[in-house]
């Protein structure tokens, strides 16, 4: 269907659409439209009685093609977030899905009448996914796994597909294969355990493990690199089949050979081996872009490369690029309005103006009336670090990391000085000078009038991110990183003189001047007062941050006023003896993160609640208090605050809350129950954020490229980085959706050939995903009774939230063997999980194992992962206890973040007293706490403390037993790599398993693109004295390699755990 883009015609009704040659009917009138070469729309004269200009569009165009599949002469692929089907006979693509979400990885059924595919949903950070089938133009959902990590591997028959998913596994890296009936949705798990792809032809089964598509890490050679296993006896036994020095993916059986993609020779190409894994051949010779996502019908092969689809015929040894022209309206590429609050990340106030940044665009307005005006460039921009100058103009940073002044009159003055990546900006009160810091750890002062820049200071340890101006605009203060974990407060003059105020032995931050120039306020973590940990034998510092002030002149502290002498109004800064004029506030320590001095002796203190970090997700909101320097009292000012800022004269405060922007005078106590001006509410409906995706996507790609150039840890390794941008920019004209942009960005990031190059999108312009409720159990359909029989109930820890099956809740108490007949009054036929979508509670009609009828109300789980994980851990722990007769304990560490820290101590407390420990870091997702855990394991038991009554206590307290055995695998990475290496290095015990992931170039997560997409750059490369940089893109070899073969899963064997138990018992 031809789509017309009408400029300015935003309100109209199309009463009919009819095609007669080139005659189209709109608003009951006929219009003749001219075409050039039968493809390009070239004009229209009149529309509904008015004249409009039509943008020239293409009826057929080159698009971005992904995930091809082939069945005879039919090709399926995805583009424009939909599935398309074309015949090789006429090459006319037909869209067969519309608007479901992001459709990916289609597979054509043997008859060619059905196509199964994945649908991904990502809306405002919420994500999900499942499998659909389209037949006769109708799409229907056939699985309810609720996981984005689900995809179709292929068809078994006309009625059954194989789906790869992480459903009901303890880790997202652990995916298995399910057989799914597309007619009734019933599922059956295949017994081959962890895999990432599977191909079946008669008795030959080829299984792929490891990565199948890794665009963001080209040249990957670590422990998770793809490899192939083969069975020639229908799955009874398997042998490792193909393992090269690079990634191996997408196996396909064509005649008597197995084809696959690999980049072991530098670039992803098509290869094959015979059924014995010999006679390796290369069939393509691409050198620029990778071959990806290959598929075959057993005769010919298709794959994608740089947005094109190629067809390879093994019999003819011929390669053809398919010339596909897509008739698409590119709906998701059309301009749109977005919510200003959802994408607002900066807001400042000064004088009579408020300025804010939303979706990278700058808007200026008066607080209470008048319009909002967009300043600077309108589209394809990202401004940041804005400040309002005294005349109402706005200064900030543009895409090129240049300071810019955006005039109210629409002008834009670029300050053409190279400061590298500008991290923070602060304008002086007189609007004539700018303090700025950069990614080179430098602090600069720039004078606007004379265009002069001066380097003030440079750290060797970290970014300089906090600074403030004295009201006379001659002095300024900043927090200076002095060491790895220490920071001092420095005072500097614009002429370059610098004085350190505080000693470099604590962590001092958030400097802020009193608006009258008498004091400098700051926060410091210096008063270390430990508290007992409530769980483990340890002490910690939970509330250590205290506000301080520096008396800048020769007068009394406000906390020590003389009886009959008024304080001086002298605003001169006296340097001599200033380090002795640092005074703490007479209040208790708290978790303060920001202090700001305001007019009339008001001081604002912002803090975050001390709470568990393990389950903390989304935005964090804090508590804002105000301290009155006159009456020496502190009170709550506002709660649930995202951030705040003061005007330049510090008389007004601007609050960013979860769903509103509010402005108050610092002397007025806010009334959050009122609306409008009384409640300080800024009317943001005046701000219209209009986005042209095509221009925005180009800006996003360029920023991603530039951030990598600025922050990648080794400048020499990116010496050819300038050539990378045009290589991927040329693909932008072909993409139509935000998902396709992600693919291009990730391919570009992969050119670093380094770990931790991530792009995590926030929104793919899809419907919001609906959760699929969980019952914490496994089922099989009972044909005779027409109900779902419970075959397993996952048992976790009933005292922990989300770690107990709701079928075992009080009053419910269902058991294995009970059969669910109805759910909410509907027959529980088809897929049982289809009855649980978007449900909080359900009513189950049950036939118990002894034949009785029972009705129960069940509160479903929103996420079963925690329960499945706890079940897996407890099963392993019980197994270790049983096999060792209680002599060995078991600990699993799922990551090196908050959950991993908690899991370690949760298990260590109950296991450390045993004679030995099995320490399992398989599937460890990394983080930063490996050193804290290793400290505990390094504390070895050397004796016992004997009480009069009770058992002897290991000494030192909570010390580790002498015998430790570690288990690691290819899915242990990042800080999991480091833990595995140091376990060996410190000779804590034997490490067994498989080579680890191999990604140890760390990141500093702090950058988001204009649409809230998170991107990272590898910034810190780990170099160990033994292996140098050798862990990156290789991993850590265990002392003893132990595989878990697919047939081990068939026979329910964990050979790695068995080996660890055996080795530990031998050492005992």
Swiss-Prot record:
Q: Name one GO biological process term.
A: proteolysis
Q: Where is this region: C-2?
A: 865-1068
> Segment Seven-bladed beta propeller: which positions?
338-686
Task: Give a GO cellular-component term.
Answer: cytoplasm
SMART domains according to UniProt: TSPc
Query: Active-site residues?
Result: 756 (charge relay system), 974 (nucleophile), 1032 (charge relay system)
Region described as C-1: 692-762
Binding positions for substrate per the UniProt entry: 927
Give residue numbers for the site Transition state stabilizer: 975
**Top-level taxonomic group:** Archaea
Give this protein's Gene Ontology molecular function annotations.
Answer: serine-type peptidase activity
Keyword list (alphabetical) reads: Cytoplasm, Hydrolase, Protease, Serine protease
Q: What does this protein do?
A: Degrades oligopeptides in a sequential manner.
Q: Tell me which PANTHER family the record gives.
A: TRICORN PROTEASE HOMOLOG 2-RELATED
Q: Could you tell me what this protein is called?
A: Tricorn protease homolog
**Protein encoded by which gene:** tri
